[in-house]
């Protein structure tokens, strides 16, 4: 059965909330079941009982994999299953809740449509699921953030037929992934800042040294041991000479975190999830973002989470590996085998390339998602990226020079 884009589904019921080139819409669907490979992001598809097509609810582009849809040729073999009618109004929220940046930057803004709908449908319920069938609970930051926002939710399932399901288009993608987000998104981010006071530091460094404490359950997708700064100890030592305190955002509650960033005077950090918390910082905050090789080439849109502050960049890093396909880079299988065409992540570079292969059902390569591992020869692979998540090291002298310029 063919898969239709959300923006072209049920067009007579679309509600336009922002008349911009991106266009922020709410699509109203009736008598809907959730289907697909599974009902978790990014595989969930929607099927109205009255139509002969499926709907892809994800109005976005996965930048690292250059995909708009995770189904080949926009087709899926839909098999109807018995479903139980569920009355009432629901708002679809099965988005990326595993990767911290994507949750904060891409997922949360869609709540704008939810808040607008509540004005007309006060009993509307948020319909959500984890990002993978093997994950039974959310990371603490997800539940805590929804609590701060005053949003309760129900877990989606594939045996219910939802009487009325509203689906919002993206405020950060929508065909313009590499352009500034909708202004409507900022109203949601402003709601995220808690009311607690904080005695935390005003000048701090967002550490990626997760091995210091070993507590990663509040981190979401954990790349700190893959896109690892090999000499981060030296980075921390240098910054301490300037009164810049090392913090671990994963050890803070969401309310503590948003409060800390809302009062920050100076923030230094390696580009990644921790730095997107600058969304909660005022324009007066000075920030220094340490870029890593090729990261911004793929994820240039990340800058929109930081550039409202007094932002400087430090391009002081280089890869530490020298193999053709770097450790933790993404590759595509091109050799003749049953795996041809699949995308994976390099886990080892000795005696061939050890690769964790995706079954085309994930948007990233979270280490706690189960995947099969295979060994390939170099000629059986081609690069998907040039090592945006590979280990690197900082040039401390250059970093210190860039810091001094910011402090002048």
Task: Label every model-predicted segment.
Residues 1-330, 342, 350-351, 357-408:
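The feature primarily captures lumenal catalytic ectodomains
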């Amino acid at each position: 059965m063919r898969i239709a884009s959300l923006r072209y589904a049920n067009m007579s019921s679309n509600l336009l909330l922002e008349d911009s080139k991106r266009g922020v819409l709410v699509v109203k669907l009736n008598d809907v079941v959730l289907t697909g490979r599974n009902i978790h992001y990014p595989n969930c598809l929607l099927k109205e009982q009255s139509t002969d097509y499926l709907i892809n609810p994800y109005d976005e582009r996965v930048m690292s994999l250059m995909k708009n849809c995770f189904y080949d040729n926009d087709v899926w073999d839909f098999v109807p299953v018995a479903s139980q009618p569920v009355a009432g109004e629901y708002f679809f929220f099965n988005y990326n809740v595993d990767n911290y940046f994507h949750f904060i930057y891409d997922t949360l803004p869609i709540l704008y449509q939810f808040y607008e709908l509540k004005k007309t449908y006060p009993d509307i319920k948020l319909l959500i699921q984890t990002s993978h069938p093997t994950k039974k609970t959310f990371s603490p930051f997800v539940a805590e953030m929804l609590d701060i926002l005053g949003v309760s939710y129900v877990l989606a399932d594939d045996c219910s037929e939802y009487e009325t399901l509203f689906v919002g288009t993206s405020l950060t993608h929508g065909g313009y992934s590499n352009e500034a987000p909708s202004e409507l998104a900022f109203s949601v981010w402003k709601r995220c800042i808690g009311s607690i006071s904080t005695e935390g530091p005003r000048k701090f460094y967002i550490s990626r040294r997760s091995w210091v404490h070993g507590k990663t359950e509040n981190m979401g997708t954990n790349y700190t041991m893959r896109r690892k700064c090999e000499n981060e100890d030296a980075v921390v030592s240098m910054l301490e000479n300037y009164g810049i305190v090392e913090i671990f955002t994963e050890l803070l509650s969401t309310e503590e975190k948003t409060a800390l960033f809302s009062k920050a005077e100076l923030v230094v950090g390696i580009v990644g999830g921790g730095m997107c918390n600058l969304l909660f910082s005022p324009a007066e905050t000075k920030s220094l973002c340490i870029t890593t090789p090729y990261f911004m080439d793929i994820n240039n849109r990340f800058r929109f989470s930081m550039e409202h502050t007094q932002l400087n960049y430090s391009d002081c890093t280089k890869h530490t590996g020298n193999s053709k396909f770097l450790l933790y880079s993404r590759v595509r299988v091109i050799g003749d085998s049953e795996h041809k065409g699949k995308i994976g992540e390099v886990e080892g570079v000795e005696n061939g390339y050890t690769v964790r292969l995706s079954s085309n059902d994930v948007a990233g390569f979270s280490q706690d998602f189960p995947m099969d591992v295979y060994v390939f020869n170099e000629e059986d692979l081609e690069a998907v990226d040039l090592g945006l998540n590979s280990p690197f090291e900082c040039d401390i002298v250059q970093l210190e020079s860039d810091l001094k310029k910011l402090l002048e």
